Design a protein with these regions (language model features):
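Generic structural motif recognizing short loop/turn segments at the entrances and edges of beta-strands
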Residues: 1-3, 77
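Structural alpha/beta surface segment adjacent to cysteine/selenocysteine redox centers
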Residues: 11, 17-118, 203, 207-214, ...
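C-terminal cap of thioredoxin/glutaredoxin-like
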Residues: 3-6, 12-32, 102-105, 109, ...
Length: 226
């Protein structure tokens, strides 16, 4: 029986792009079925304390540029750290990805064109004709999918993805969720690989030692609501 993994991401995310090919190769090696779940990062950030790039401290913004260059080299991807059409309204692109999933098709080939479209090829993914071209280019029925992407059912699926992400504490892009354990960021792919190779049980985020339990319950009961 195939194992599966939930993949929360957005096409606006450089980290999702940088890790996408490596992640997909990993899923092939481990025979994992991938549940592709595009999400709205502004909504996720608002609910989990994350900040959009322009709200972060300048030092953090500068460090991000260094990290993009490091990981560009590490993963061997083409990436412009200041792409022409970024940031952009990603809703149409993410909704199209949802529509592909809902149609029963695998969105991987589309994503392999769309991600570098933003970060390497200076394409505007907020433009519907660009999306049609990319989808057509990988053999998908682009016009039908574009119409489906505007449907109420796709909108509800997108909202459900967001709800599910929040329920499992997937608070950024990309997040890979294996048996309930969240691996946040493409720089955790090697840790995900280790978990899959070892076959260990999923780590939990609600376990504390007996001493920690005693300290919270008896010494600092005010921390129970923290």
């Amino acid at each position: 029986m195939h194992r599966s993994i939930d993949y929360y991401f957005s096409l606006v995310s450089p980290s999702a792009y940088i890790g996408h090919a490596t992640f997909m190769n990993l899923t092939q090696r481990h025979s994992l079925d991938v549940n592709f779940k595009p999400v709205s990062l502004p909504t996720i950030f608002a609910e989990t304390g994350g900040l959009p790039l322009n709200k972060r401290a300048p030092a953090r913004q500068r460090y991000r540029i260094m990290e993009l260059q490091r990981w560009r080299e590490k993963r061997g991807v083409r990436l412009n750290v200041h792409p022409k059409f970024w940031p952009f309204n990603v809703e149409a692109a993410d909704h199209l990805t949802v529509a592909i999933v809902e149609s029963g098709a695998n969105p991987n080939q589309f994503l392999r064109k769309a991600f570098p479209g933003v970060w390497a090829d200076e394409r505007n993914l907020a433009d519907e004709q660009t999306l049609v071209m990319l989808a057509d280019g990988v053999g998908l029925p682009a016009q039908k999918l574009l119409a489906d992407a505007k449907s109420e059912s796709v909108k509800k699926r997108y909202e459900k993805n967001i709800k599910e992400a929040l329920e499992v504490d997937a608070f950024g892009s990309p997040c890979y969720v294996l048996n309930g354990e969240v691996f946040w960021g493409q720089d955790r792919i090697e840790l995900l690989d280790d978990a899959l190779t070892s076959g260990r049980k999923a780590y939990r985020n609600d376990i504390c030692s007996s001493w920690e339990y005693f300290a919270i319950r008896c010494i600092h009961p005010d921390l129970q609501s923290a």
